[in-house]
C-alpha cells in the first residue's frame, strides 16, 4: 500500500484533515469560475473537461490539458483506489486472502484504513485541493459515489452469504441420508437388518396361517376344491405384500427416528399394502359372493366403513381380487371338468364360470350333457346363463342343514359333489317355487367351505 502511493508523483500535499471534512472545507471557498451545473443535468458532478471549447482553440489540446489536470489532482490516487475496490467487489470468487489491512480488500473497513494511509502519505506535501474548485468538487463527489457503491456491494455480499448459509442448513435438514452415510453407517445397517428380519418373520407367520387354514378346509371338504386355489392366491398376494415391505425397507434405510418410521408407514399405505384385518373382511365378502363378485355402491361404502379404507381402495382391491383369486379358481374348475368347454375370453362356455370382459360374471350352463330327462338348455332366454325358472336341481342329502342354500360345487360339472339326477325322476319333482337364479339374485350367499 505504501509503495503504491510512493509511486504516484503528482501529490500537491495534505494538511492532515480527514476526507469527511474535505467537502465542508471546500464549500466555503468562492468559486472563481462559473458552475458546470448549468450545462449538464447531473449538477456539479459533470466533468470540468467536458466544457465546450471556444472555436479558436484546438479541441485536442484542451482535452489533453483537462486529462492532465484530472490525473495530476491530489485526490486522483484515492479515486483510483476506491474504483479498484469496487471492481474487486464484483469479482467472483471474492478474494479473502487478507493481503491488505482489514482483511478483505474490497470491504468498506479496508477503505477506511486506506484513507488513513493516504492521509499519512500526503501529510507533508502540498495542499489537498488544486486551483480549480470545480475539479476539486468533481473528485470529492466521485469518491463519495464510489464509496456508496462499495457499501451497497458489501450489503449484497452479506445477503448472499446469509442466503447460502440458510440454504445449506435447510438442505442438511431435509436430506438426512447424507448424514446417515457419514455418521450413522453402523447403526443404519443394524436397523435395516432388524426391519428386514421383522418382515421375514411376518411372512413366515402368514404362510403358517395359510397352511393351517388350507388343511382345515381340506378336512371339511374331503377333496381339494377351488378353495385351495383361492388360498394359494392369497398366499401369493401376502407374499407379494411382504416382498413390497422388504423392497421398501431396502429402498429407504432407517435412520432410527420416529419420523422416518411414520414416513415408511405412509408410503406403504400409498403402495396398497392394506391391514390384514381389512383384507380378511374383503376376502370373506368375496368368497360369499363368488357367483357375482361385484359389490354394489352401497356394499362398497359398507366395506369401506368396516375396513377403514376409501371406496376407491376397496374398488381397486376387488378388481385385483377378481384377477388373482377368482380367475385361478375358474381355471382350476376348467381343468378338473369332464366335458366342459374351455375358457374363452370372448365369453364362450367354460364349464362353470365365464368372465364377460370386466363387467359381470355369471353362471352359464355347460350343457348338462349327463343329465337325462326332458330339460333342454335355452341360453337365449336367460341372459346370465341360469337354468329356466321351472328347473330345480336335486338337493344333495347333506345340504339340508346348510344355511346358505345349495353349494357351488353342485353347479360345477365333473366335480365329485356335482348333482346327479335320477333317470326316472318325474317332472313335478323338478319344479320349485324359486329357481336357483332367483335364490342367488335375492341375496342368498354361496358358501364353498360348507363341505
From Swiss-Prot:
Check the record and name the CDD domains matching this protein.
homeodomain
Q: Which SUPFAM superfamilies match?
A: Homeodomain-like
Record's keyword terms, sorted = Activator, Developmental protein, Differentiation, DNA-binding, Homeobox, Neurogenesis, Nucleus, Transcription, Transcription regulation
Per UniProt, the ranges with Polar residues bias are: 34-43, 231-242
| A Gene Ontology molecular function term of the record | DNA-binding transcription activator activity, RNA polymerase II-specific
InterPro entries assigned: HD, Homeodomain-like_sf, KN_HD, PKNOX/Meis_N, TALE_homeobox
Give the Pfam families listed for this entry.
Homeobox_KN (PF05920), Meis_PKNOX_N (PF16493)
Q: Residue ranges of region Disordered?
A: 33-64, 206-272
Q: Does the keyword Nucleotide-binding apply?
A: no
Q: What is its main location?
A: nucleus
Instruction: Specify the MEIS N-terminal domain's residue ranges.
Output: 102-185
The answer on whether this UniProt entry bears the keyword Magnesium reads no
S-S bonds: none
**Might you report a single GO cellular component term?**
cytoplasm
Q: Which GO terms describe its biological process?
A: angiogenesis; animal organ morphogenesis; anterior/posterior pattern specification; brain development; central nervous system development; embryonic pattern specification; eye development; hemopoiesis
Q: Where is the composition biased (Low complexity)?
A: 218-230
For this protein, the DNA-binding region equals 267-329
The protein's location, in the record's own words, is: Nucleus
What is the documented function of this protein? A caudalizing protein which is required to pattern the anterior/posterior (A/P) axis during central nervous system (CNS) formation. Inhibits anterior neural expression and acts as a transcriptional activator to induce posterior neural gene expression. Maintains a proper A/P balance required for hindbrain formation by activating the FGF/MAPK pathway, which modulates the planar cell polarity (PCP) pathway. Interacts with retinoid signaling during hindbrain patterning.
For this chain, the family text in UniProt reads:
Belongs to the TALE/MEIS homeobox family.
Protein name in UniProt: Homeobox protein meis3-B
Q: Which organism is it from?
A: Xenopus laevis (African clawed frog)
Q: Gene encoding it?
A: meis3-b
Amino acid at each position: 500500500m505504501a509503495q503504491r502511493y510512493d509511486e504516484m508523483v503528482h501529490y500537491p500535499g495534505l494538511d492532515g484533515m480527514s476526507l469527511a471534512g474535505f467537502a465542508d472545507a471546500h464549500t466555503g471557498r468562492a468559486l472563481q469560475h462559473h458552475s458546470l451545473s448549468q450545462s449538464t443535468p447531473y449538477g456539479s458532478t459533470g466533468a470540468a473537461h467536458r466544457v465546450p471549447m471556444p472555436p479558436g482553440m484546438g479541441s485536442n489540446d484542451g482535452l489533453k490539458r483537462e486529462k492532465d489536470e484530472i490525473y495530476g489532482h491530489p485526490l486522483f490516487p484515492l479515486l483510483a483506489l476506491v474504483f479498484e475496490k469496487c471492481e474487486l467487489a464484483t469479482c467472483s470468487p471474492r478474494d479473502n486472502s487478507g493481503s491488505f489491512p482489514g482483511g478483505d480488500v474490497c470491504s468498506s473497513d479496508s477503505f477506511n484504513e486506506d484513507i488513513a494511509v493516504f492521509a499519512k502519505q500526503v501529510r507533508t506535501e502540498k495542499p489537498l485541493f488544486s486551483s480549480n474548485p470545480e475539479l476539486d468538487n468533481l473528485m470529492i463527489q466521485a469518491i463519495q459515489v464510489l464509496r456508496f457503491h462499495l457499501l451497497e456491494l458489501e450489503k449484497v455480499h452479506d445477503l448472499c452469504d446469509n442466503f447460502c448459509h440458510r440454504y445449506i442448513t435447510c438442505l442438511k435438514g431435509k436430506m438426512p441420508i447424507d448424514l446417515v452415510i457419514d455418521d450413522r453407517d453402523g447403526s443404519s445397517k443394524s436397523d435395516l437388518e432388524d426391519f428386514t428380519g421383522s418382515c421375514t418373520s411376518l411372512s413366515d407367520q402368514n404362510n403358517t396361517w395359510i397352511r393351517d387354514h388350507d388343511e382345515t378346509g381340506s378336512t371339511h371338504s374331503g377333496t381339494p376344491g377351488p378353495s385351495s386355489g383361492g388360498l394359494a392366491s392369497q398366499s401369493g398376494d401376502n407374499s407379494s405384500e411382504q416382498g413390497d415391505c422388504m423392497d421398501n425397507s431396502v429402498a429407504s434405510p432407517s435412520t432410527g427416528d420416529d419420523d422416518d418410521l411414520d414416513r415408511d408407514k405412509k408410503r406403504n399405505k400409498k403402495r396398497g399394502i392394506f391391514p390384514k384385518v381389512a383384507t380378511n373382511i374383503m376376502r370373506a365378502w368375496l368368497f360369499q359372493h363368488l357367483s357375482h363378485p361385484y359389490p354394489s355402491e352401497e356394499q362398497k361404502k359398507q366395506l369401506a366403513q368396516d375396513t377403514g379404507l376409501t371406496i376407491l381402495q376397496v374398488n381397486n382391491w376387488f378388481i385385483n381380487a377378481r384377477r388373482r383369486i377368482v380367475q385361478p379358481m375358474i381355471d382350476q374348475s376348467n381343468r378338473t371338468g369332464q366335458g366342459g368347454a374351455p375358457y374363452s375370453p370372448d365369453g364362450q362356455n367354460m364349464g362353470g364360470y365365464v368372465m364377460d370382459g370386466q363387467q359381470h360374471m355369471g353362471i352359464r350352463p355347460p350343457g348338462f350333457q349327463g343329465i337325462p330327462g326332458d330339460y333342454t338348455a335355452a341360453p337365449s332366454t336367460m341372459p346370465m346363463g341360469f337354468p329356466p325358472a321351472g328347473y330345480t336341481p336335486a338337493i344333495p342329502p347333506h345340504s339340508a342343514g346348510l344355511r346358505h342354500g345349495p353349494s357351488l360345487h353342485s353347479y360345477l360339472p365333473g366335480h365329485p359333489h356335482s348333482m346327479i339326477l335320477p333317470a326316472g325322476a318325474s317332472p313335478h319333482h323338478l319344479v320349485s317355487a324359486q329357481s336357483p337364479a332367483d335364490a342367488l339374485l335375492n341375496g342368498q350367499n354361496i358358501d364353498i367351505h360348507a363341505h
